[in-house]
Amino acid sequence: MAAILASASVSTMKTLWETKIQKIQENHNNQRRKPRSRLVAADVWEERHTLARLRDKVKMQDGRLLLCLEQEDWKALPGCLVRLSQVQEWHIHRTGLQKIPSFISLFSNLLVLDLSRNGVTEIPKEIGSLTQLRELLLSYNKVRFVPEELGDCESLERLELAINRELDRLPDKLSQLRRLVRVDLSMNAFGTIPPCLLRMPALEWLDMGGNRLRSLPQDIYRMQKLRALWLQRNLLETVPESVGRMSRLDTLVLSGNRLSDIPPVMEKMDNLRFVNFRDNPLTLEMAAAVDEEEREMFGREFMLTYIQEARKRALDEAN
């Protein structure tokens, strides 16, 4: 009987100790969880605070929801921004933004993505999910590469990549952009007009001023709907005669190149209303206009006079 009691007493003591140890362990675990809980709570509070800040920057304009951030510190956009996926336009300027988040693909209703004047270095391939996007504005950034997925943005009408400095090519797939009307690639490092631009059926306005163009493609006339072509401050020495087949062209800016002559075929470009050959080493010396305003206004007259004078001198030399 004593042995049984002793055994029961040992068993009871063992159970008590095990229970005590378990409670100590639970208390220890609870103490470890508390800092984590505090961190989680802090994260939740920070996310709510950030989301509230972003919501304050959303406004309605012309029936659209716009997110507008100007001169604030947003080097990276927080994940909580996806809670505002109904926004149709982003206008984020001078924030130091360095990266377009991959979750941009969740903004399926986005019409305008304007991230001008930031520090964006690349365009994510997820951009191709934005099939409703009409305007992509990334001028004054540091973009060096354009992904071919941009060619999937079938609604794109306006593309601005000016002053990215080192950008020097576009993927061929961009020729799929059947609605693209306006392209600004000025102040970059292009050595030639990207072939994809020649196959964009709706293109009307192209600025490639301030690049490194040394020549123009012979099939430049394929841009049949082009109305304005800006090629100022390049390294062009000649203009191909095929430019005469660009029947809708009404503005042609060639100032600040290395042109020595004007193609006679341009005399027949009846739609050409504004043309600028200023600051080129043209072979013939023509009388200067009274002032800059007059010179700009009579650019076409200067061109016609130059061509006629060149023809006359050629005949005189032949005789």
Predicted ranges, named:
Residues M1-C196, M200-Q218, R227-A228, E241, ...:
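The feature captures the LRR N-terminal capping module
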